[in-house]
Amino acid sequence: MAGRPGSSNAEAAGAVGPTDEARGQAESSQKIEDLMEMVKKLQKVGSLEPRVEVLINRINEVQQAKKKASEELGDARTVWETLQKELDSLSGEKVRLKEILSKKQETLRVLRLHCQDKENEAQRKQTMLQECKERISALNSQIEQEKNKQRQLRLDFEEQLEDLMGQYKDLWEFHKPERLALEISTLDSGKEQLLKEEKLVEAKLEDVKHRLCSQFGAKGHTINEGLFLRSPEAAAVVHLFEEENRKAQELLEAAAQRQEQLQQKCQQLQQKRQRLKEELEKLGVQVLAQAQSKQEEEAGLGEAANPKPLGVSEEKDQEPSTK
């Protein structure tokens, strides 16, 4: 940029040099022509002698002017050559500066493109970062929901397990096999006792009949037996015997019915116990499978957000299920 005024000055100097030279030559030739015309005029007039001294002075002046013009012309040529050299050097400097400017402009363009690429990359990374933050927030909320759901499932499972364990405990306490076996043995012994009493009553009845037969004889057996059977004592004995027999039959039937009910109840309790055990095993397996699957899902989701708290929650979730 600093070379431009110099180049303009050099061009101006180059233009001024030839102009001064032409001007000096024109002046000297003009003076010579003036002198020649003056000489011709004097020759015509005939008064040349008085003007010789004037002519000599004028010639001297012309020579001095010519010499001065020649010197000025030499100086102008020297200046012109110097300015021409300076102009050439400034032209080369101008070309070099143009090349440097072109390179700088190309570098600036590349840097601008690079800066634009960096800005686009930064914008893209900022967008990706924002998306990752939103995704992490969504995953954290989803993990929290899964934790709450898992906690609720665990609480429900614990309540169901406690309820089933309470029912199983009540059934086990009130209907133990030892207790049922004891009741069955008690009923069996009562049944045997009733059978013994029935046999004893039958033996007593046979004994009474035998005594009656021995007292009244074989002949009047039917008459005496009929009279005896019609008597109030016989009716009372028969009524008593029938009452005892009926009671014994009722007790025997009640004992048999009770034994059958106890056996059926024992079978039902065993079936119910087996069913409760199967339900407990099935429910435990299902809950464990659900807990394991939920924990695996939480572990998979927590790898992107916060795996360590997720692992701690999984250990907390596994503790009640193992208990």
From Swiss-Prot:
Keyword Cell cycle: yes
GO CC annotations on file: chromosome; synaptonemal complex
A biological process term (GO) from this entry: synaptonemal complex assembly
Region of interest (Disordered), ranges: 1-31, 294-323
Biased composition regions of type Basic and acidic residues, renumbered to the chain: 20-31, 313-323
Swiss-Prot/TrEMBL keywords: Cell cycle, Cell division, Chromosome, Coiled coil, Meiosis, Nucleus
Chain segments annotated as coiled-coil in the UniProt record: 25-290
Localization per Swiss-Prot or TrEMBL: Nucleus; Chromosome
Polar residues bias spans: 1-10
Matches recorded under InterPro entries: SYCE1
PANTHER family: SYNAPTONEMAL COMPLEX CENTRAL ELEMENT PROTEIN 1, SYNAPTONEMAL COMPLEX CENTRAL ELEMENT PROTEIN 1-LIKE
Biological function: Major component of the transverse central element of synaptonemal complexes (SCS), formed between homologous chromosomes during meiotic prophase. Requires SYCP1 in order to be incorporated into the central element. May have a role in the synaptonemal complex assembly, stabilization and recombination.
Subunit structure: Homodimer. Found in a complex with SYCP1 and SYCE2. Interacts with SYCP1, SYCE2 and SYCE3. Interacts with SIX6OS1.
Record-stated family: Belongs to the SYCE family.
Protein name: Synaptonemal complex central element protein 1
Source organism of this protein record: Bos taurus (Bovine)
Lineage summary: Eukaryota, Metazoa, Chordata, Craniata, Vertebrata
Gene: SYCE1
